[in-house]
Amino acid sequence: MAKKKATKKTAKTEAIEVIFSFDTTGSMYPCLTQVRRNVGNMVKKLFKQIPNIRIGIIAHGDYCDEGDPYVITMLDLTDDEKEITNFVKNVDSTFGGDAPECYELVLYEARGFSWSSGKSKVLVMIGDDIPHTASYAGNTKNLDWFRWLHGFHSVYFS
């Protein structure tokens, strides 16, 4: 019986774009410290393992942080590893001071990033609370967080 020659299959890598969002309020300081410490290695691995990946970053406090230092600050999708790492390492911490947090604003703002057509859209949210309701006084756009989930390939909450 003749043996079949083994052929090497080429793995098809899915085109993907990812936004990492992290809560920068006081209760998240220990996590933020770890994120800053490990971001360089994480970004390097992602770019090595996923060809043509683009990564965006959203750092957010809460509505009570308006102007001191910020409610939300963002880095649009990019393939510049150094820019991503520097953004995360240098983003200011916020205060928060109440619960919930403005995760609904993150979902809303993420939709405005420069997503490529034909690529999977992934949002990874790192936080320790729940989103505000649409009726919350600080939520001046009356954002319903559930409505803004649609359109992403995957949304992960941690």
Question: Predicted regions span which residues?
Answer:
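Divalent cation-coordinating acidic motifs and surrounding scaffolds
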Residues: 1-158
